[in-house]
Amino acid sequence: MARLLLAEDEEVLRMLVSDTLEDDGHEIDEACDGEEALNKIMAHDYDLIVLDYMMPVFTGLEVIVKVRAIPEKKHSMILMLSAKSQVSDQRAAMDAGADYFMAKPFSPIQLSEKIEEILK
């Protein structure tokens, strides 16, 4: 179906979400921090980039700002995931350039449904 990058520093959550999305037929690349995510974004084209807000090395916000500054990557679709669910956090993500925001906690099924909605 689609090629996605899942950048999430919580290993158990990353594995659970990745397995769910693979079961949906998606090809998933994984990153455990912002630097690894940025390197993969530079090396590949993704239908959707799913970023955790708070990650080591570069936060999700920092990754978004860097991606939006690269002409050939600036139109990448980005979904920000975050345990920081205040309106100000959502606004910060959208102001940085996220296309979508989803607050934690969520079930893998809820994320799967959100991704299907985005990719339509």
Protein language model features and the residues they cover:
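Conserved acidic carboxylate
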Residues: 8
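Charged docking surfaces used in two-component/phosphorelay signaling
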Residues: 15-23
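Acidic, metal-coordinating helix/loop segments flanking the phosphotransfer/catalytic sites
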Residues: 30-48
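Receiver (REC) domain active-site loop signature in two-component systems and cognate sites
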Residues: 55
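C-terminal output helix
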Residues: 106-115
